[in-house]
Amino acid sequence: MGVQRLALALIAFTSALTSVIAAPIVIEQPPLGPEHRYDAIVIGGGPSGLSALSSLGRVRRHVLLFDEGIYRNGATRHIHDMLTNDGVEPKVFRAKARQQISRYTSTSIKDVKVTKIKKVFEHGGRKYFFQVTDKTGAMYTASKVVLGTGVLDVLPGTPGLQENFGKGIYWCPWCDGWEHRDQPLGILGPLRHVMDSVYELETLNNDIIAFVNGTEHSVEDILYLNRKYPHWRQQLKHYNVQINNKMVSSIDRLQDGSKHQDKKTWQEFDKFRVNFNDGTSVERSVFITNFPTEQHSDLPDQLGLARDPIHKNKIKVNFKGMRASVPGVFVVGDANNDGSTNGNHAMFSGKRAAVALHVELEQERAEAALGKRDESFSAEQVENEALKLIGRDTEELEELWGRK
């Protein structure tokens, strides 16, 4: 009987889905002005935004991408740990991506900053679109929006830190650690984050000094470490990590790894001097940083997007489709809260959002053609309704179908 009920449920669901798919296809033409809409507008020209643009272009969505020309990895020498692009300069990667995407003629790119964005309701609030304004005052509209606006690293004002960030001073071991392996390393940041970096770097560097800048005796940091790593003091001794609690006054570059490198081994040999307030100094070849980030753009706040309750510098998304709290908005790359910040993740999230957006948009248009469209309709709603209709999880379904 269970199999029969399941079969009937599947037939009913298939029938309902077929009625939607059979609806007339509504294709919007390329926009000619503010009164015409794009299928989607993507804001951000890094890996996540370009990935979304590419995926949407491949299904002939009319999409416009805005790129203001500021990138988190803009200062880094090369991209690493990205298959087929290991060692490529970030600007070369972006140029190649643009060239390849250009074959999808329903896509376009504008190199200008977006300053305003708002959601506009129409038809009594049952439908909506997004209005985007760039810094020249030009307006554009779209059915959906993808934000790949990224984050900013909030660096202290220590002289020499900002100027050298991304070149021998990095925040991601996978992005730059291999090129500085087996070199004297410094950890820059509060005490609470030292163990995280030690665990990440132990296979690459074993001469480590943590420059905690006066936080060694911070009660808050110590309590945090006691909770997260109960044996952290013993672990630091085990790894022979030194804690330097002096206040850092400046960092001087002594050698540039872009000029001193071994191209056969892919090693870069930077060298720095850390100067302290007491007049003493220490030399290191490379640094990893543990400083906070913040949203690069205020566009998420203009739309009223919810933040992650714990990591408040991140925009909360539904990981299944990168949907933000406002229907029609997708947030990809470092800006969202799905827990990873690197180029591979950025492209994955852009791809996932593009697929969800494409399907959601077509489902909405099919429903509109049938006169059933309402503001609450979404791809996620369809998924939930399908689960209710079937009433079984995946493992139960496999077990039922396996019975004779």
UniProtKB/Swiss-Prot annotation:
Chief site of localization: secreted
Glycosylated position list: N213
Cofactor-binding details, from the entry: Binds 1 FAD per subunit.
Subcellular location: Secreted
Keyword Disulfide bond applies: yes
Entry GO terms, CC: extracellular region
Superkingdom of origin: Eukaryota
Keywords: Disulfide bond, FAD, Flavoprotein, Glycoprotein, NADP, Oxidoreductase, Redox-active center, Secreted, Signal
GO molecular function: thioredoxin-disulfide reductase (NADPH) activity
Subunit structure: Homodimer.
Family note: Belongs to the class-II pyridine nucleotide-disulfide oxidoreductase family.
PANTHER family: THIOREDOXIN REDUCTASE 1-RELATED-RELATED (PTHR48105)
Name used for this protein in its record: Probable thioredoxin reductase ARB_06224
